Curated annotation (Swiss-Prot):
Keywords: Acetylation, Chromosome, DNA-binding, Nucleosome core, Nucleus. The keyword Cell wall biogenesis/degradation does not apply. GO terms for biological process: CENP-A eviction from euchromatin; nuclear-transcribed mRNA catabolic process, non-stop decay; regulation of transcription by RNA polymerase II; silent mating-type cassette heterochromatin formation; transcription elongation by RNA polymerase II. It holds the Pfam family Histone. This is Histone H2A.Z. Transmembrane segments: none annotated. It comes from Aspergillus niger (strain ATCC MYA-4892 / CBS 513.88 / FGSC A1513). One of its GO terms (cellular component) is euchromatin. The lineage of its organism: Eukaryota, Fungi, Dikarya, Ascomycota, Pezizomycotina. The nucleosome is a histone octamer containing two molecules each of H2A, H2B, H3 and H4 assembled in one H3-H4 heterotetramer and two H2A-H2B heterodimers. The octamer wraps approximately 147 bp of DNA. H2A or its variant H2A.Z forms a heterodimer with H2B. H2A.Z associates with the vps72/swc2 subunit of the SWR1 chromatin remodeling complex. Also interacts with rbp1/DNA-directed RNA polymerase II largest subunit. CDD domains: HFD_H2A. It is found in: Nucleus; Chromosome. Belongs to the histone H2A family.
Amino acid sequence: MPGGKGKSIGGKAGSKDSAGKSQKSHSAKAGLQFPCGRVKRFLKNNTQNKMRVGAKAAVYVTAVLEYLTAEVLELAGNAAKDLKVKRITPRHLQLAIRGDEELDTLIRATIAFGGVLPRINRALLLKVEQKKKNKTEA
């Protein structure tokens, strides 16, 4: 029944060779955890003039995003471990990003509930040291 509904004859669906193989996603082929297909869709939707996006471009952007995420999470995990807690909070992310010079220049965003870095101005420290020195002399 070639023209009606039902099983089709031929094509890739009916071949015996493809029955044993399982499909691998672009992420699995590239050895990534982040979804390459979703990143490619976002790239296609957010480009102007509906430009074409190559598969390798999506894989590359996905790899960069995964690397940066792993880097930030590792540093935030170390910050949480130093404070002897088991949960990463926005404060730990803030400490991790602002503690690394390269990440600080890359991520200039304000992190909600991140707080501020502890820092005392040198001019204020000099005044405190001078007061202590004057008290010891007197």
